[in-house]
Amino acid sequence: ISIIMFIYLVAALFNLRIPDTGARYPEQKINPVQLTKDFFVGFHILWRDRLGQISLAVTTLFWGAGATLQFIVLKWAETALNMNLSQGAILQAVSAIGVAGGAVWAASRIPLKSALKVLPYGVVMGLLVCIMAIYHIEYLPSFALFTVGGFVVNFNLLPAYLLLIAVGWLAGYFVVPMNALLQHRGHVLLSAGHSIAVQNFNENLSVLMMLMLYALLIWLDVPVPIVITGFGLTVAVTMWLVIKKHQANQAEYDSLHLIGEAKH
């Protein structure tokens, strides 16, 4: 907890150094009814925008899937890798390393104009998750490869680490450009605050719904491999549908030139 508090403190200090952008907004209403009305106006604007709906759909799926995957990894570690809870938490950290790497790679390689080119990576990520369902620690011999800070990396766990790094990398690689595009469209069509409010509402609703579904499957004692396969296929199929929707939008009207336009 102390480490987390320290990180938040450092983040707050960084925020203090952010320069004033000069943006000034009119005084906001405090009437709850009017605020709710304004929120849903922004909600519909962003979902109806051809670029906004694609990026919002992807980020919404990502946060819901990401939160659920954290719990799936723990269950997978218990049933397939013979790990306890603390050992399973290490797998979550391994996945986070992949996400960070993919995010940095995307930031250095994908310009805003090319953001939508990363959509197929979401399909690949979903299919890669399905591979988790077929791997078990007993498939390979167990012997120590190397030690990192007192943590022993065994040979039969190496595929699990590599798989989670790959899944995390793909997730970070496709969500960063989508988030950048969403922030851009939100800035153009609404405002930074209204856009973030709509984004957070959708993302948290996605987290809630997907975790409820996962909890139901666990309560029904559905085998973990089936849960993992269903989860991976859901992500892959949803991303495929998003791609088809984008292609249909482009067939009707080329909206890519809107990327980079000034605020209305």
Please annotate each region the language model reported.
Residues 124-153:
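C-terminal ends and interior cores of transmembrane alpha-helices
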Residues 1, 5-8, 54, 62-70, ...:
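Substrate-agnostic recognition of the 12-TM MFS/MFS-like secondary transporter fold
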Residues 117-132, 229-232:
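Structural signature of the two symmetry-related core transmembrane helices
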Residues 1-24, 93, 97-98, 125, ...:
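Hydrophobic alpha-helical transmembrane segments
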Residues 101-116, 217-218:
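Helix-to-loop junctions at the C-terminal end of transmembrane segments
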Residues 1-2, 44-101, 119, 124, ...:
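A single, central transmembrane helix in multi-pass transporters
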Residues 4-30, 112-113, 136-140, 243-254:
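Helix-loop junctions on the cytosolic side of multi-pass membrane transporters
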Residues 20-56, 80, 145-154:
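Juxtamembrane intracellular "pre-TM" segments in multi-pass secondary transporters
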